[in-house]
């Protein structure tokens, strides 16, 4: 007698397997078809600017990432609204779909109202299945892998962790990725290769030119400083 297709309740209760998740890296065909988002925090120490959280947005098609420091989780609503408006104006495209976990910050009425105002469809992951938001989860791991190295090598104090995270994402967006045929996320999004000439190591020494009123003719014309990241340009 064949037992190949025989199952009993006890066997199912004891041996129920977890179905594998889709290994596809991308399901989008154009930029901003799908954005992954997640919030990390609170940090054990506040940054220089008072931030203890940060939120990341990852475009599924280009793998380009945006990161924003926040003092409180409640700032997510305004941060996302500003981000969606930036995408709409700078790229002439709406965010069609947004995927996140089921945390209250994403399911509250005010956040849902903002999504509806932009016509964005919200996809929530099933409880206990962080793999469905895997792009954002892996991005956090990548960010922290890059954050630790400069903090340790440059001996930068922990309160500069927020600035280190911004620097890390700026760098990640300019590193070739096998997910997008070894192009950089920057090139995949902007359709032009990134400029590398201005990149510097986090925590390295730099010299800032002083304004004429900040020194006299016998004093130094620059000040020795520590490089902590790039301005928004």
Whereabouts are the PLM-identified features?
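Anionic group-binding determinants
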Residues: 1-233
